[in-house]
Structure formats: structure tokens, C-alpha cells
Regions:
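Folded, non-transmembrane soluble domains that reside on the lumenal/extracytoplasmic side of membranes
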Residues: 1-168, 182
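Juxtamembrane interface at the cytosolic side of transmembrane helices
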Residues: 175-182
Length: 182
């Protein structure tokens, strides 16, 4: 089945607690529930509206153009803050695309989007692990947008610099000791 923009059902219209449109059941019910819960918490804490769309095919349509058109048609994000995000996966193209509103581009940059896709999502998708790829990708997106991933990354960098300082101190002490013995 090949979807057009007009064929894609917007689940949010019938249930505002649903964030995943998956008409062909590519994801398991458990994965959809997990993603819906994460994105519900994200919207409650930040106001950011997110839609995840899983489609088997869009034919020869370009995923970039399809995503932008769907994003505009659905009006994802609040009008004043333009804080929406669409995560579109097209199975037969084996591609995932993030479309962001201007209001979150400073946080969900193209580089961050690509990093999440290439490190967390695409490797799992290549193995047919649609659930794992989408759940881990959405988790990273939610952490990025609510600020917790930045805090984790900052802590990681601090830990690394502390380790390097300790290592330099130990090596320096050993060299002084060896020099004093010789």
C-alpha cells in the first residue's frame, strides 16, 4: 500500500493522547504505547507537539518533501511558538526523516537529528528491529528536547576530563619516581 499525503490518518484528531500513526502496524502495540507515553510526557513538560508516522510506502515521493507537506497539513506544533516535530519512517525506502518547526531548531538541530538517526535508529532498522529503532530514537529526541540529554552529555565530558587529569597525574608521578630511583 502506497500512501499519499491525504491518505495518512492523523490519530491525534480522534485521540489527543496518541502520537503514533502506524496504519500498517509496523510497530508492536507495546512500542506504540511506549512512544505515546514518552511523547505525552514531553508535551506536558515542554509544550512540544510531536507526531511519529510509520508508513510502508509513499511510492516515488521524496521523503523530505512528503514530510514537510505532512507537517504543514497537520499543523504540528503551536502556532505562536512553531514547536512541532514530525518523525516520518518509510519502510520500503528504509529512511527516517525529522521535520522540525522553527521554534525547536535551536535544540533539535539537523546535526543532532542526523546523529540520533545514524547511531540509534538506522542500525536497528537495518536489522528489521523497527520497535527498537523507533523507541530508542524517540527516547533520545525526548531527552534532547527536554534538556536532559544535554545535561548527560555535559556530565560525560566532565567525567572524561576528570579521568584525563587523574591519568596525567599518575603518569607524571610514576615518571618522577622512576627518575628519582635512577
Amino acid at each position: 500500500w502506497q500512501y499519499t499525503i491525504d491518505d495518512v490518518p492523523n490519530v491525534r484528531l480522534s485521540d489527543a493522547r496518541q502520537y503514533v500513526t502506524d496504519p500498517s502496524a509496523i510497530l508492536s502495540a507495546t512500542a506504540r504505547d511506549s512512544i505515546n507515553a514518552m511523547l505525552g510526557r514531553l508535551e506536558k513538560s515542554t509544550g512540544i507537539e510531536t507526531a511519529v508516522v510509520m508508513l510502508p510506502s509513499i511510492g516515488d515521493e521524496d521523503i523530505f518533501d512528503f514530510g514537510h507537506e505532512l507537517f504543514r497539513k497537520w499543523g504540528i506544533g503551536k502556532k505562536k511558538s512553531d514547536n512541532g516535530l514530525l518523525i516520518l519512517f518509510v519502510m520500503d525506502q528504509k529512511k527516517v526523516r525529522f521535520t522540525t518547526g522553527y521554534g525547536i531548531e535551536g535544540t533539535m538541530t539537523d546535526a543532532m537529528s542526523k546523529r540520533i538517526q545514524t547511531t540509534l535508529m538506522i542500525p536497528r532498522f537495518k536489522k528489521g528491529n523497527w520497535d527498537g529503532g523507533m523507541v530508542s530514537g524517540v527516547r533520545a529526541v525526548a531527552k534532547t528536547l527536554d534538556g536532559s540529554m544535554q545535561a548527560e552529555e555535559d556530565n560525560g565530558e566532565d567525567d572524561l576530563s576528570d579521568i584525563l587529569i587523574a591519568l596525567v597525574f599518575i603518569v607524571g608521578t610514576m615518571l618522577i619516581f622512576i627518575y628519582a630511583m635512577g
